[in-house]
């Protein structure tokens, strides 16, 4: 009797389920980035001696966009990573203090406070693998110039050396007594420098992992360090409001910059030529110096919020990006405007941005923040209204545009008062400019020392290549 009632109950459930309308499935297409097509176009044009086509502000010109290294002149604005493409996060979310692209640009390495490395694919933005790298929070990591090695540092002061397949080959225990904040390789990868909250910098021999020299002179935590891409010159930034330049051969401080009034958070040499040095501080300022002219200040930009980190563009030597405490991104061009950003993304992240990284090819830009997410940004298609004013990150979520819905391959909305991006003015030279809402600066172009200059870099005494 019980079995008969059970069968009758199951039949009734099946009838009820068959009468219910089927669940509606929302299908979203995952975006992917293919950089091979622009390179095929570039190779074809060079092989047959053809000029590169000028990209006009019209959607059909998308197929004519070249790779980033083809735009080094006035059309360099095309290389701005203004289009939000994808958001990624680990299943178990942690704050992300550092991200770094692999040298070939195919994967993004993400380091977390849990001591893990996770790898994300650069084309489809899919998760690839996860590994436990350190016992404490990974605070920084850096690839060598020859792409054969990677070094990482953690909050316990430990340094680890990795092969490209993430096989650890050496561990330097107690390299510093406090958390390691930054590290950098020398131009020939024979040495690397680290800085820490223990107020000192250390130079290490990469071949044997031995400490060679201690650079002492800062009076508080050393927040950042960088090695000149060509010369024997190290720059460091500290909580004592100073930026110092060091001679790695003697270990002496050769110059100090006293322009800042608060903690200097980050400093970086220009990666292409190394003529310029940029630093940001908690006094809400960003300054660019020319190392060839006694550290002459070329630019000073102030903001209402703190700058947290910075990154130079890998292809265009005059362009760089600043990340702010409120989660916004600001893109600058030294040849366009010295007083304000040429592009601002106000809601790039929900919380403070901790790390930036340009793909070595220059077509993808990755950002990480304390909202525990990684966001990928790419170059915009011509006349795409969402490129510079996307409701995804400008907090104007209209017409149902939000994460997961605007991932269609033809994600171009109708023009409206929110993000209606007009084409460039008729007076502008037709130089392959994509849609720019408030982007064109009509001020006269200003020449900056240190960019496209033939003056040699080795003008500081004792600093030869």
UniProtKB/Swiss-Prot annotation:
Q: What is the lineage of its organism?
A: Eukaryota, Fungi, Dikarya, Ascomycota, Saccharomycotina
The keyword Nucleus appears for this protein: yes
Q: Which SMART domains match?
A: WD40
Q: Which SUPFAM superfamilies match?
A: WD40 repeat-like
The yes or no answer to whether the keyword Protein biosynthesis is present is no
Q: List the keywords (alphabetical).
A: mRNA processing, Nucleus, Repeat, WD repeat
Q: Where in the cell is it found?
A: Nucleus
This protein is called Polyadenylation factor subunit 2
Oligomeric state and interaction partners are given as: Component of the cleavage and polyadenylation factor (CPF) complex, which is composed of at least PTI1, SYC1, SSU72, GLC7, MPE1, REF2, PFS2, PTA1, YSH1/BRR5, SWD2, CFT2/YDH1, YTH1, CFT1/YHH1, FIP1 and PAP1. Interacts with YSH1/BRR5, FIP1 and RNA14.
Cite the record's Polar residues compositional bias ranges.
454-465
Give me the stretches of Low complexity compositional bias.
Answer: 1-20
State the GO CC annotations: mRNA cleavage and polyadenylation specificity factor complex; nucleus
Protein source organism: Saccharomyces cerevisiae (strain ATCC 204508 / S288c)
WD repeat residue numbers: 133-163, 175-205, 217-247, 259-290, 348-378
InterPro entries associated with the record: Pfs2-like, WD40/YVTN_repeat-like_dom_sf, WD40_repeat_dom_sf, WD40_rpt
Q: Where is this region: Disordered?
A: 1-26, 417-465
Q: What does this protein do?
A: Integral and essential component of the cleavage and polyadenylation factor (CPF) complex, which plays a key role in polyadenylation-dependent pre-mRNA 3'-end formation and cooperates with cleavage factors including the CFIA complex and NAB4/CFIB. May bridge the CPF and CFIA complexes.
- The UniProt transmembrane annotation reads none
> Can you supply a Gene Ontology BP term from the record?
termination of RNA polymerase II transcription, poly(A)-coupled
General remark? Present with 7810 molecules/cell in log phase SD medium.
Q: What is its main location?
A: nucleus
């Amino acid at each position: 009797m019980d079995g008969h009632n059970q069968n009758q109950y199951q039949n009734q459930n099946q009838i009820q389920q068959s009468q219910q309308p089927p669940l509606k499935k929302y299908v979203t297409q995952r975006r992917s980035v293919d950089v091979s097509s622009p390179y095929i176009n570039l190779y074809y044009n060079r092989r047959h001696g053809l000029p590169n086509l000028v990209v006009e502000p019209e959607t059909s010109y998308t197929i004519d966009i070249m790779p980033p290294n083809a735009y080094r002149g006035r059309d360099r604005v095309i290389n701005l990573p203004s289009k939000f493409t994808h958001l990624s996060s680990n299943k178990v979310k942690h704050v992300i203090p550092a991200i770094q692209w692999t040298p070939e640009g195919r994967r993004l390495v993400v380091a977390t406070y849990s001591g893990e490395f996770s790898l994300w694919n650069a084309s489809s933005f899919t998760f690839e693998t996860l590994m436990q790298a350190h016992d404490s929070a990974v605070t920084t990591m850096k690839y060598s110039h020859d792409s054969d090695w990677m070094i990482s540092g953690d909050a316990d002061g430990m340094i680890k050396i990795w092969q490209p397949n993430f096989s650890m080959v050496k561990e330097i225990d107690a390299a510093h007594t406090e958390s390691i904040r930054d590290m950098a390789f020398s131009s020939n990868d024979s040495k690397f420098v680290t800085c820490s909250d223990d107020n000192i910098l250390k130079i290490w021999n990469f071949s044997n992992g031995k400490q060679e020299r201690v650079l002492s002179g800062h009076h508080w935590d050393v927040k950042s360090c960088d090695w000149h891409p060509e010369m024997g010159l190290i720059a460091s930034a500290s909580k004592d409001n100073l930026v110092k330049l060091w001679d790695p051969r003697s270990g002496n401080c050769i110059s100090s910059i006293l322009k800042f009034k608060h903690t200097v958070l980050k400093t970086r040499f220009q990666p292409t030529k190394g003529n310029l040095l940029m630093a940001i501080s908690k006094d809400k300022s960003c300054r660019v110096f020319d190392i060839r002219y006694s550290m002459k200040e070329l630019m000073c930009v102030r903001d209402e919020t703190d700058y947290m980190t910075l990154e130079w563009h890998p292809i265009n030597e005059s362009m760089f990006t600043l990340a702010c405490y409120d989660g916004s991104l600001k893109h600058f061009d030294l040849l366009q405007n010295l007083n304000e950003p040429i592009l601002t993304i106000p809601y790039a992240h929900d919380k403070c941005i901790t790390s930036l990284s340009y793909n070595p090819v220059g077509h993808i830009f990755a950002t990480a923040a304390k909202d525990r997410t990684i966001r990928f940004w790419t170059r915009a298609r011509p006349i795409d209204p969402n490129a510079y004013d996307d409701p995804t990150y400008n907090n104007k979520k209209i017409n149902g545009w939000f994460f997961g819905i605007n991932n269609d391959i033809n994600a171009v909305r109708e023009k409206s008062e929110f993000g209606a991006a007009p084409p460039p003015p008729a007076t502008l030279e037709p130089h392959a400019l994509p849609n720019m809402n408030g982007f064109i600066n009509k001020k006269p172009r200003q020449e900056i020392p240190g960019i496209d200059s033939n003056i040699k870099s080795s003008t500081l005494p004792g600093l030869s290549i």
